Amino acid sequence: MRVYSVTQSRFGVCDVPLVEGQINSREPSILALDSAGLPRRWINLEDAAAYYCRGAVAWDLGDHAFTLHGGVNRASGEQSRLVLRSIVAVRGERGRHRGVAQTPVLLRDMLFARDRMMCAYCGGRFRAADLTAEHVLPQSRGGSNRWANLVSACRPCNHRKGNRTPEEAGMALLYVPYTPSLHEGFILRNRRILADQMAFLMAGVPPHSRLHGPDPAAVGSVHTRV
């Protein structure tokens, strides 16, 4: 098990106050699940610590642990500490999130990550700044702004296709667009995923996902709404 040692404050709900400090923003996030084991959100170490202190963690798992160091007990001379695991299930989350959509929110850079930064028409790989969210069936012709009608396209290919379908433009799609699963969405939106978190999420990714190709951890990025 890999252990991270961090000093942090502002927990409030803890029985023993922790000394002043700051979590490194480059530290990986904690994967928060509901009580049924479904992923719900990425949280920082401070939020995870608050769940532990309130007794709201139903169960946890993972090969990584984060140790938060607190104040020193005057009587014993021992320093308080709180150990967080990299994956935590939060009590009450299942009921609170009933009816939550299983389809990830459509974000431009998550689309590019789904498509592995590859243009659907020429097959080139590009930076996010050089890609566009391209509607297979143009919106002006009734095409929807949904995952299954969007592909990543470089700017020249997008301009060449214009307001036509791929068939009309003579530009065959190199891959088929699809709607990511709930688990896949969590991978696409985080660029700093620990190996145990990745293994947990990949277990819920359907076989047709392109994340089953090489290096799924390389797809994370910063996100902008489409």
Label every model-predicted segment.
Residues 20, 108-110, 143:
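Short, flexible, glycine/charge-rich loop motifs used to bind or transfer phosphoryl groups or to couple energy/partner
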Residues 23, 112, 145-147:
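Short coil/turn motifs at beta-sheet boundaries
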Residues 36, 144, 157-159:
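A generic structural motif
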Residues 95-107, 133-141:
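Short Cys/His-rich Zn2+-coordinating modules
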Residues 123-152, 161-177:
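Histidine-centered nuclease catalytic patch
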